UniProtKB/Swiss-Prot annotation:
Xref: PANTHER family: IRON-SULFUR CLUSTER ASSEMBLY ENZYME NIFU HOMOLOG
Compartment list: Mitochondrion matrix
Subunit structure: Component of the core Fe-S cluster (ISC) assembly machinery. Interacts with frataxin. Interacts with the mitochondrial co-chaperones JAC1 and SSQ1. Interacts with NFS1. Interacts with ferredoxin YAH1; interacts with the reduced form.
Family: Belongs to the NifU family.
Function noted in UniProt: Scaffold protein for the de novo synthesis of iron-sulfur (Fe-S) clusters within mitochondria, which is required for maturation of both mitochondrial and cytoplasmic [2Fe-2S] and [4Fe-4S] proteins. First, a [2Fe-2S] cluster is transiently assembled on the scaffold proteins ISU1 and ISU2. In a second step, the cluster is released from ISU1/ISU2, transferred to glutaredoxin GRX5, followed by the formation of mitochondrial [2Fe-2S] proteins, the synthesis of [4Fe-4S] clusters and their target-specific insertion into the recipient apoproteins.
GO cellular component, one term: cytoplasm
Organism in which the protein naturally occurs: Saccharomyces cerevisiae (strain ATCC 204508 / S288c) (Baker's yeast)
Protein name: Iron sulfur cluster assembly protein 2, mitochondrial
Amino acid sequence: MFARLANPAHFKPLTGSHITRAAKRLYHPKVIDHYTNPRNVGSMDKSLANVGTGIVGAPACGDVIKLQIQVNDKSGIIENVKFKTFGCGSAIASSSYMTELVRGMSLDEAVKIKNTEIAKELSLPPVKLHCSMLAEDAIKAAIKDYKTKRNPSVLH
């Protein structure tokens, strides 16, 4: 019996359709949408004074998020947002959703976003709440970076 189990000829590889069906059973449709069609993926020039960059990670699972905001210096409104995430579907979905959420917000509004808002919108299970926490930490880090660039003598 064990010899049969050890024989690779008896295993069928998972195809894209198998993976998609499994994901649909485990994830809410909003997570699948943001994972398969992520919004605002990319990078901005972090050396620009009106661009704030936040890079955060979770050592326990290996997820890393880089989130960047471009702020209108006169109005304080976030005009552009980009992200790159190395991580699971929930981390990518949380990042993508965050970019949609903060575009058009003031810095004061964006810094108040809590991970629970993201988790609720995406219907994340408790085991994936850390992904929404990373998105919250990333926007806060990006805002801090932007403010530090604008006034380096003040700690935020």
